[in-house]
């Protein structure tokens, strides 16, 4: 990376200008699932219409390949496990729906304009620099910050919903390795580890790694539209790329914990934590 530029993907002309002289676009920009509960229209505008702007920028600048980063949330309450790319899509939130719209727009630009595209459904990403603050706060960093302040990590519901976690550095390596791969055009891939963890087991492991088991867990009411189970089958991706993850779940958690320990020495993180149900 030789330069960076901040812009909003809702500004079409700016997207087109920023994409000049680029060879590849990895489109990760979006607003998250929690945001979609209280601001559905804005969430749609950024995630769906914004994606259309980035696709148009790719087309007008003759980008070599456009990579659309989707989400496991598009699968909703699927009953087909482990989840393959062929599983039915039935998102529960505007976030999931808007990301699925982005997939369709991406495929349409491949079909109509011969733009080389790939859709990547990445399961739950985690690691250093993940959002811990406000309604964007994710369970792993938010819980680490609470534990650092001797507060119990919070579980919404009974703690039995599951997720398939993928460490951010493995994600970065997986994405970078796609450049120049001849086997991925106009294809959709799941990316994950193929191992599911309950929220309860996840937080007990974080407590153990931080040597704070005595804190225990705090249980709050279920959140609306929480997908109950996400467990991926990503063989299609691994076979097409020969990718191998470098991080075990425990090692990824250790690196993540250390990042927030270091960050907490520079700023008061707990004041930015916001705990509420998605309805509010």
Model-derived features with residue positions:
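N-terminal Rossmann-like NAD(P)+-binding domain of SDR-like oxidoreductases, especially those catalyzing
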Residues: 1-125, 247, 255, 259-263, ...
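Short, conserved catalytic or interaction motifs in soluble domains
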Residues: 33, 128, 193
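Short secondary-structure boundary/capping segments
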Residues: 34-35, 80, 144-145, 180-181
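Short glycine-/acidic-enriched loop or helix-start segments at secondary-structure transitions
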Residues: 36-37, 77-79, 129, 165, ...
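Hydrophobic alpha-helix immediately C-terminal to the catalytic Tyr-X-X-X-Lys motif of short-chain
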Residues: 101, 105, 109, 139, ...
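Conserved catalytic loops of nucleotide-sugar-dependent glycosyltransferases that act on lipid-linked
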Residues: 132-139
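C-terminal substrate-binding subdomain of Rossmann-fold SDR/epimerase-dehydratase oxidoreductases
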Residues: 148-280
């Amino acid at each position: 990376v030789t330069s960076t530029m901040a812009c909003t993907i809702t500004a079409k002309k700016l997207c087109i200008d920023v994409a000049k002289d680029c060879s590849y676009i990895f489109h990760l920009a979006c607003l998250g699932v929690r945001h979609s509960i209280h601001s559905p229209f804005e969430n749609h505008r950024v995630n769906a219409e914004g994606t259309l702007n980035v696709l148009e920028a790719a087309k007008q600048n003759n980008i070599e390949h456009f990579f659309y980063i989707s989400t496991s949330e598009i699968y909703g309450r699927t009953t087909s496990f482990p989840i393959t790319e062929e599983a039915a899509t039935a998102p529960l939130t505007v976030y999931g729906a808007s990301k699925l719209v982005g997939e369709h727009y991406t495929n349409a630009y491949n079909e109509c304009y011969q733009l080389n595209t790939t859709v990547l459904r990445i399961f739950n990403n985690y690691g250093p620099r993940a959002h811990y603050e406000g309604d964007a706060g994710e369970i792993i960093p938010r819980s680490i910050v609470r534990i650092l302040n001797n507060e119990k990590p919070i579980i919404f519901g009974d703690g039995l919903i599951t997720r398939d976690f993928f460490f951010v550095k493995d994600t970065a390596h997986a994405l970078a390795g796609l450049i120049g791969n001849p086997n991925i055009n106009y294809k959709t891939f799941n990316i994950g580890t193929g191992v599911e963890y309950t929220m309860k087991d996840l937080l007990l492991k974080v407590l153990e790694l931080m040597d704070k088991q005595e804190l225990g867990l705090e249980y709050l009411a279920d959140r609306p539209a929480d997908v109950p189970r996400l467990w991926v089958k990503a063989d299609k991706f691994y076979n097409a790329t020969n990718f191998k993850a470098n991080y075990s779940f425990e090692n990824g958690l250790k690196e993540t914990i250390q990042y927030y320990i270091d960050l907490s020495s520079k700023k008061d993180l707990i004041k930015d934590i916001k705990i509420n149900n998605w309805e509010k």
